[in-house]
UniProtKB/Swiss-Prot annotation:
Its main location: cytoplasm. The gene is argG. Keywords: Amino-acid biosynthesis, Arginine biosynthesis, ATP-binding, Cytoplasm, Ligase, Nucleotide-binding. This is Argininosuccinate synthase. It is an enzyme of class 6 (ligase). GO terms for molecular function: argininosuccinate synthase activity; ATP binding. ATP binds at A10, Y11, S12, G13, G14, L15, D16, T17, S18, A37, G119. The lineage of its organism: Bacteria, Pseudomonadati, Pseudomonadota, Gammaproteobacteria, Aeromonadales. It comes from the Bacteria. Homotetramer. L-aspartate binds at T121, N125, D126. Belongs to the argininosuccinate synthase family. Type 1 subfamily.
Amino acid sequence: MSGINKIVLAYSGGLDTSAIIPWLKENYDAEIIAFVADVGQERDDLEGIEQKAIASGATKCIVKDLREEFVKEYVYPTLKTGAVYEGTYLLGTSMARPVIAKAMVEAALAEGADAISHGCTGKGNDQVRFEGAVAALAPQLKVIAPWRLWDMRSREDLLAYLETRNIPCKATLKKIYSRDANAWHISTEGGELESTWNEPSEAVWQWTVPAEQAPDQPEYVKLTVAQGEVVAVDDQPLSPHQILTTLNERAGKHGVGRIDITENRMVGMKSRGCYETPGGTVMVAALRAVEELVLDRPTRAWREKLGAEFSHLVYDGRWFTPLCKAIVASANAIAEDLDGEVVLKMYKGQVTAVQKKSPNSLYSEDFATFGADEVYDQSHAEGFIRLYTLASRIRAMKEQHQAIGGDHTHG
């Protein structure tokens, strides 16, 4: 196609992108470069991926290790805001898209590409996230979205397309799931999940065991938090990615972090997905425990507002925006005092903070005790209550006055 000489494809080796390489070769007179982002997905997914991309028709395959950058620069800032989409979704796929798109744009510019391509469907959120990032970072790049162009409409069509071209793929007609994994989570959609009346089979879950099959004894883990970031597990300092992978393994064995939700997509439809975020669920519990100790009431309320707004920004693909930067800056300021240690209990699908302390804690046992104390004069509460309820008292007095025929105009 005129004006396009080199295309960088976001390549996973999965069903969609396995079909896109030959499709691009057949429909565009351009060089195809496969770009693989390692954000902590299953190691099996990366094994032999360069050879597979070349065999599928790519002239080159770039594999970029983004694991530490993903957790440090995208997961941790999101955790500080407290963002949770629609009350349950910890934004695993949403957070990964901007780091992938940014690295992909950098690769496209370095390779002198004219366009990028992705395997996102025309029904999903990811097309908006990828293309929104490109628009913000390199608007001169063209975007090719095969799912919005070709005549294939189902995963079955793609399997047939690949079979005629002798291109291998793990997906089968018997087990058709759409999965997305990174260091933070793994999501599963499709198959029996397309009916909300179907209970997910155990084949859906990859990282976690059923709660009823989890160990009968709880496991405890101690997390150290510094300025709103988890920096150590059981007093052992680790990198952000190492911390997450460690917690994924330990929490997954106890069935922690499973959710089955039906969410509102950006494009207007609802979708159902089963998400597993074992380590992330533990980290969130630890950070909330430290917040409970450190943040005063108005600061915590503000942080909750930040989280609500940020969850939509991340979900909607608006990471590279001024508002996103402003919210992250505000969350970082709040997190400056979020230092502490938390012991969490993992048991039968649940995680609970059972011990917590912070050098910046506003909790005082002397003030909070239900026993005798020497620091709090309870008579002081009377004056506070009179001022706190003053507006209510004035309103009630005026209503009483009006009810007996008093002056309705006097202010």
